[in-house]
Amino acid sequence: MLMKKNASFEDFFLLLGFSNWPHLEVVLFVVILIFYLITLIGNLFIIILSYLDSHLHTPMYFFLSNLSFLDLCYTTSSIPQLLVNLWGPEKTISYAGCTVQLYFVLALGTAECVLLVVMSYDRYAAVCRPLHYTVLMHPRFCRLLAAASWVSGFTTSALHSSFTFWIPLCRHRLVDHFFCEVPALLRLSCVDTQANELTLMVMSSIFVLIPLILILTSYGAIARAVLSMQSTTGLQKVLRTCGAHLMVVSLFFIPVMCMYLQPPSENSQDQGKFIALFYTVVTPSLNPLIYTFRNKDVRGAVKRLMGWEWGM
């Protein structure tokens, strides 16, 4: 009886995605494919360059490489499925596939929230505690911070995704989204989901609001340090590196807050799809451009790498 009531691994979900706008599907396919390729190329470029050039073996670029790898995994967890659904008439995903997708989307999104806090602490230590920076950001400690970001994401996701799929899905298998996400799946349940919705709100507050508060606190201290600087060169370098990180933080947290920290409503469902599309497709493609644009360290690394290749 329980097997009949609950979904089995042979069941499928139908991802409605952008089926309300069939005339946009071809355009969306092309645009999303372009952004996905930019994401792959840009983030792989940062990872490879940071690995090959010894001058970039610093805490800042170590964390940036982790962020790039996170973005690669995050987009790959949902975008290929979306492209397949946009290209052809088949818009289904298996129960097992939906479970795996939800797990990785939650895990990688949570890990990115924590990693952005770690990166803001690195900037705080560099600007406000420059004499103690090498001690504060010891390579071993940096590896521990990066590992903590990943572990917190995957641990939290294991609990949250299990809690989501624990409820019986008694209705149709129509998921009104382009990937498996918690609010869309909760709408398929025929039982009271207030506990799940409360859990979602609490987890969103812990891993969205608290990281954002910590980041803003770090940059408040950085702002005070910047205002007291006498060196124009130092000021420009701080503004360049911290400005890039602040822009990345804004592009990630603002859409996520609009998505998960507002009351659910029927009217906002379509709007939510485009918000989710922004932080899963656009933001990961912009991060490499933001960090490398007019970045002297990256330009120098490219010149050294090209010079080494030509010298060979």
From Swiss-Prot:
Native organism: Homo sapiens
Glycosylation sites: 6
Pfam families: 7tm_4
InterPro entries: GPCR_Rhodpsn (IPR000276), GPCR_Rhodpsn_7TM (IPR017452), Olfact_rcpt (IPR000725)
Top-level lineage group: Eukaryota
UniProt main location, coarse: membrane
GO molecular function (one): olfactory receptor activity
Example of a GO cellular component annotation carried by this entry: plasma membrane
The protein's role, per its UniProt record: Odorant receptor.
Subcellular location: Cell membrane
Stated family: Belongs to the G-protein coupled receptor 1 family.
Membrane topology (Cytoplasmic): 51-58, 122-140, 221-237, 294-312
PANTHER family (UniProt xref): OLFACTORY RECEPTOR
Alphabetical list of Gene3D superfamilies matching this protein: Rhodopsin 7-helix transmembrane proteins (1.20.1070.10)
Protein name: Olfactory receptor 2J1
GO biological process, one term: detection of chemical stimulus involved in sensory perception of smell
Transmembrane feature ranges: 27-50, 59-80, 102-121, 141-159, 197-220, 238-260, 274-293
